[in-house]
Amino acid sequence: MELQFLGTGAGQPAKHRNVSSLVLKLLDEINEVWMFDCGEGTQRQILETTIKPRKIKKIFITHLHGDHIFGLPGFLSSRAFQASEEQTDLEIYGPVGIKSYVTNSIRISGSKLPYQIHYHEFDDTSMGKILETDKFIVYAERLAHTIFCMGYRVVQKDLEGTLDAEALRAAGVPFGPLFGKVKNGQDIELEDGTKIFAKDFISEPRKGKIITIIGDTRKTSASVRLAKDADVLVHESTYGKGDERMARNHGHSTNMQAAQIARDAGAKRLLLNHVSARFLGRDCRQMEKDAATIFENVKVVRDLEEVII
C-alpha cells in the first residue's frame, strides 16, 4: 500500500508544485488505484509515474474548487485512449454537482468514453460510511472550507492471521489437503491420531491500515474524528506558523494546526500537503521544524513523492 502525490500545491499550478491530486495504490490488496482530487495537469503528472490509468477505479473529490477538479475532463478523456489496455468502469465520489460538472464537460467537448462512470454524490445529509467493499470501508465528513468540502477516512479491514508453515511441518503435517485445511482454520487429525488445532499455528488477525485525507479546511473537530488513530494523516497546510488569521479568513489551515489535529487524533504520521507556492525548499524545512514541536513525525510532501504505508 502506497500513497503517491501528483500535485501538492495550493490554488494554482506553480513551478515546483502542481495543484491537488494524490493516489492511494492498493495494487497488492485489490489491484486498484484510488485517486483523491484531480486538479489541472494531473494527467501530465501521471506520465511521470508508473500508474496505469485503467487501474484507477475510484476517484474521490473533496470539493468543487477548480484546483481540485479542473483536471478531471482531460484525465477521463485520456483514460479512454488507452487502446492497448482493457477498458474498465470508473466510480466518482464527491459533493453534489460533480456529476453535472463532468457530464457537461464531456458533452460540450464532444468526448466519447468507452467505459461507464458511476457517480456517488453527497451532501450534509449523507455523511458517514460512503463505501464498503470486502477489504475496505470509506467514511466521509464535512470539513470547514468556504464551500462544501469532504474529508475521507479509508479503513482497511483487519487482515487474517498468517500460517506458521514451518511449525506445521515440524508437527508432522505434510503439504497437501491437510495443510490447506489448517490454513483455512480447520482442526485436523493425523493418521497416528495426533490432533492438530489450527489456532496453534495461525497468528492473531492483523490490524488494517487507516489513511485519512483532509481536503481544504479550517481547523475543525471533524478532522480529528476522521484522523483517529490513523497510520497516515494527509492534511492541508496552505499557511505557515503565525498565519492563523489569514488561514481562517480563507478557509484553510496552517502547519501548526495540522500538527495539532494529528496529535489530538493519535495519528502515527503527518504529511503536510496543499502548500502555498510561496513556501520553497528552506521554507518547507522550517514548516516541518515548526510543526514538529507539536507532532514529531511530520513531513512536507513534494510532487511525485511516494510514501509506503
Swiss-Prot record:
- What family does the entry list? Belongs to the RNase Z family.
* Cofactor stoichiometry and binding remark: Binds 2 Zn(2+) ions.
**Name of the gene encoding the protein in the UniProt record:** rnz
Entries under CDD domains matching the protein: RNaseZ_ZiPD-like_MBL-fold
As for what it does, the entry says: Zinc phosphodiesterase, which displays some tRNA 3'-processing endonuclease activity. Probably involved in tRNA maturation, by removing a 3'-trailer from precursor tRNA.
Which residue positions are annotated as catalytic? Answer: 67
Where is Zn(2+) 2 bound in this sequence? Answer: 67-68, 216, 274
Q: Which UniProt keywords apply?
A: Endonuclease, Hydrolase, Metal-binding, Nuclease, tRNA processing, Zinc
Q: Which reaction does it catalyse?
A: Endonucleolytic cleavage of RNA, removing extra 3' nucleotides from tRNA precursor, generating 3' termini of tRNAs. A 3'-hydroxy group is left at the tRNA terminus and a 5'-phosphoryl group is left at the trailer molecule
Transmembrane residue ranges:
none
NCBIfam families reported in the protein's UniProt record: PRK00055.1-3 (NF000801), RNase_Z (TIGR02651)
InterPro entries per record: Metallo-B-lactamas (IPR001279), RibonucZ/Hydroxyglut_hydro (IPR036866), RNase_Z/BN (IPR013471)
Which residues are recorded as binding Zn(2+) 1?
A: 63, 65, 145, 216
Which PANTHER family does this entry report, sorted A to Z? ZINC PHOSPHODIESTERASE ELAC PROTEIN 1
- Kindly state the subunit structure of this protein: Homodimer.
Name of one Pfam family that matches: Lactamase_B
Task: Locate the coiled-coil region(s) and give their ranges.
Answer: none
Cofactor dependency: Zn(2+)
This chain belongs to the protein called Ribonuclease Z
GO MF assignments: 3'-tRNA processing endoribonuclease activity; zinc ion binding
Domain of life of the source: Bacteria
Q: Which organism is it from?
A: Streptococcus equi subsp. zooepidemicus (strain H70)
Which EC numbers does the record give?
3.1.26.11
